[in-house]
From Swiss-Prot:
Family: Belongs to the universal ribosomal protein uL29 family.
Protein name as annotated: Large ribosomal subunit protein uL29
The species this protein was found in: Mycoplasmopsis agalactiae (strain NCTC 10123 / CIP 59.7 / PG2)
CDD domains, alphabetized: Ribosomal_L29_HIP
Record lineage: Bacteria, Bacillati, Mycoplasmatota, Mycoplasmoidales, Metamycoplasmataceae
MF (Gene Ontology): structural constituent of ribosome
Disulfide bonds: none
Keyword Hydrolase (UniProt): no
Coiled-coil region: none
Biological process terms in GO annotation: translation
Family annotation (PROSITE patterns): RIBOSOMAL_L29 (PS00579)
GO cellular component: ribonucleoprotein complex; ribosome
Listed InterPro entries: Ribosomal_uL29, Ribosomal_uL29_CS, Ribosomal_uL29_sf
Keyword Ribonucleoprotein tagged: yes
Amino acid sequence: MLYKDIKVSHLMNSNDELQKLVKDFEAELWTLNFKKSVGSLDQSHKIRAIRRDIARIKTELNAREKGAK
């Protein structure tokens, strides 16, 4: 799942769902980084995309938190 999917569908979810999504992405990022260190990663562009997706979701969560105050 990349930015196109996150932009529309996931940013409308609740904060709990977004936090779960961040955890899922972080787990996937960990797996990709492990594969990279072992040398079996074929699609290295996914690491950058997932890092950016995590940042986008966290930015939305922070904006919601500041907006609620």
